[in-house]
Amino acid sequence: MNNATFNYTNVNPISHIRGSVIITICVSFTVILTVFGYIAKIFNNKNNCTNNVIGLRKHIKCSGCEPFCNKRDDISSPRTGVDIPSFILPGLNLSKSTPN
């Protein structure tokens, strides 16, 4: 009365390959979109940064573009809240910015 045994020898290997390919394509698509969103966010925020090299401003507020900003003279108020890395939410701009 042992009818609950399963025979795995008749499993179609094509279905396993097809499932693996679908999962690989989905993961690759997500990674590519994340990378492109991160690169686009860097290039969009690079032009909005205030650079202190020319010495026109003392206060530097970097929101999402820290690699392109000089923060030595940053005396702005400390930031509060939770930072959301741009690689988690690509293309989503949660920082306060002035419209062009």
UniProtKB/Swiss-Prot annotation:
Alphabetical UniProt keywords: Glycoprotein, Hydrogen ion transport, Ion channel, Ion transport, Membrane, Signal-anchor, Transmembrane, Transmembrane helix, Transport, Viral ion channel, Virion
Subcellular localization(s) per the UniProt record: Virion membrane
Membrane-spanning intervals of the chain: 19-40
Keyword presence, Transmembrane helix: yes
Membrane topology, as annotated: Single-pass type III membrane protein
Virion surface domain ranges by topology: 1-18
GO cellular component: host cell membrane; membrane; virion membrane
Major site of localization recorded for this protein: virion
Molecular function, one GO term: channel activity
Keyword Cytoplasm set for record: no
GO biological process, one term: proton transmembrane transport
Ranges in the topological domain labelled Intravirion: 41-100
UniProt feature coiled coil, ranges: none
Glycosylation sites: 3, 7
Role played: Putative viral proton channel. May play a role in virus entry.
Family: Belongs to the influenza viruses type B glycoprotein NB family.
Quaternary structure (record): Dimer.
Protein name (record): Glycoprotein NB
